[in-house]
Amino acid sequence: MTTPFVLAVPSKGRLQENAEAFFARAGLTLSKLGGARDYRGTIAGLDNVEIAYLSASEIAAQLARGTVHLGITGEDLIRESIADADKKVALIEGLGFGGANVVVAVPQAWIDVRTMADLDDVTTGFRAQHNRRMRVATKYINLTRNFFAAHGVVDYRIVESAGATEGAPAVGTAEMIVDITSSGATLVANGLKVLDDGVILRSQANLVASRAADWSADALETARVILDRIAARARANKYKEVRTRFAGCDASLLTEAHNRFGVVSPFGGPTSSGMITLHCPPAQLYALGSFLRDHGADTVSIASLDYVLDRENPLFAKLESFLRQ
């Protein structure tokens, strides 16, 4: 029996909803085997794929161990929980949801502390005055240590946080925090501010590949199929299809359209009758339409694209390159 290809997906909340919607847009329908409470699932039409519904943090751990081939999780969890992450996993594609920043935040009352250099001065002075180090509340222990070391900040100690990190300075369990934030509103509500150069990581959900997984020929082919559909949808999102026909449509006009509007002609130049199909960035549609009509087109049609399949698949090429390293 062939070993299944394992794809790990967040098991609850907005991340699960967004992940399933992402795959659905690529024509990959996920379903749970035993209903909403089951933690196993399938993809319609791909019988050898097993969906593992896990927490985002567990997905990062399983990617490191190689028990899943691909998984969706936040880059913050990858960077925090996997040492030398770039050698063990590959971030195949940022997915545009689950966005948040890991930041260094200090009390707003520290009006003279705006940068990491200022923080270095304050922590050194604090230790000299109080004979102890400043406390940093965080669950991002490794990211904090690496970032502080890169900025030469050494006079601090980490207080591991399991709950509402942003409240630690107010209740006196820490002087400052490192935490993840989307809008910053919660930090402000707790009397905190982000240092000007205190963004450690701009994170989002990623489709991640594991080096340690069993990448058999069958597994690679399954990955190619999945990534081909994702890439086809991503290409379609970049463009609208523009079609027209007029006698003055020639190669020089297409070159000008490409240079001015970023269009591509996926099927080559115009036919003998002047028929042409173009792919155009959405922001340039009306400018391109005016340009074509100014040069002789009577009618220009514009349509949305569902998928654009291409011989080259940059996502699968990225996976292959990573596995060869």
From Swiss-Prot:
Top-level taxon in the UniProt lineage: Bacteria
One cellular component (GO) term of this entry: cytoplasm
The protein's Enzyme Commission number: 2.4.2.17
Activity modulation notes: Feedback inhibited by histidine.
Protein name as it appears in the record: ATP phosphoribosyltransferase
Pfam families (UniProt xref): HisG
Any one GO molecular function term: magnesium ion binding
Cell compartment(s), UniProt: Cytoplasm
Example GO biological process: L-histidine biosynthetic process
Primary subcellular site in the record, as a coarse category: cytoplasm
CDD domains in UniProt: PBP2_HisGL3
